[in-house]
From Swiss-Prot:
Gene label: NIS1
Protein's UniProt name: Necrosis-inducing secreted protein 1
InterPro entries cross-referenced by the UniProt entry: Nis1 (IPR045469)
One CC-aspect GO term: extracellular region
Stated role: Secreted effector that induces necrotic lesions in Nicotiana benthamiana. Interacts with the host receptor-like kinases (RLKs) BAK1/SERK3 and BKK1/SERK4, inhibits their kinase activity and suppresses INF1-induced pathogen-associated molecular pattern (PAMP)-triggered immunity (PTI) in N.benthamiana. Also interacts with the host receptor-like cytoplasmic kinase (RLCK) BIK1 and inhibits its kinase activity, thereby inhibiting PAMP-induced ROS generation. In PTI, phosphorylation relaying by RLKs and RLCKs is critical for the initiation of downstream signaling.
Assigned keywords, A-Z: Glycoprotein, Host cytoplasm, Secreted, Signal, Virulence
Major localization class: secreted
Region (BAK1/SERK3-binding): 103-132
Domains: entry comment: The C-terminal region from residues 103 to 132 is important for BAK1/SERK3-binding and the host cell death suppression.
Signal peptide: 1-19
Glycosylation positions in this chain: 88, 126, 133
Pfam families: Nis1 (PF19271)
Family note: Belongs to the NIS1 effector family.
Subcellular location(s) of the protein: Secreted; Host cytoplasm
Natural source organism: Colletotrichum higginsianum (strain IMI 349063) (Crucifer anthracnose fungus)
């Protein structure tokens, strides 16, 4: 009987788990015109976070300015279904067909509400990728 109570208590603690998004990952090399999986990476966190939406963009290294997206690749509603989860989130984006081979920056902007008072934040992430002849299966992640 005491064992069941312990399991019930542990299950209650797991239900209270909090997590946040801390970055993105993208194929190291992408082919223009391909659909690719953008990975939104998550981790344990001390308080609840409501992730509202994320948008992805791509720009040449020369035109990539801090906290900008460049040409939009897509935006996605996250909401309660994809907030406070320890499982990475995957969204599909299409690389523009007309991109010339070379180095590009893929950026993301994330809108979230933090804590009991729902403090709004806008977080920015980016990774450098190569546009080439094939989309790789190796992913590169944003730095913290």
């Amino acid at each position: 009987m005491q064992f069941r109570a312990s399991i019930a208590a542990a299950a209650g603690l797991f239900a209270l788990a909090n997590a946040r998004i801390y970055g993105i990952a993208f194929p190291e090399t992408v082919k223009a015109g391909d659909e690719v999986e953008a990975v939104i990476t998550t981790e344990n966190y001390i308080q609840a976070v409501q992730d509202i939406a994320i948008a992805f963009g791509i720009a040449t290294e020369a035109s990539a300015y801090p906290e900008t997206l460049g040409n939009a690749l897509g935006s996605f509603y996250l909401g309660p279904e994809e907030s406070n989860t320890l499982e990475n989130i995957t969204e599909t984006v299409t690389i523009p067909a007309g991109l010339a081979p070379g180095q590009y920056v893929v950026a993301a902007g994330l809108y979230s509400l933090y804590g009991a008072s729902s403090s709004p934040t806008l977080s920015h992430y980016n990774v450098t990728v190569t546009v080439g002849n094939v989309t790789s299966e190796t992913y590169v992640g944003s730095q913290r």
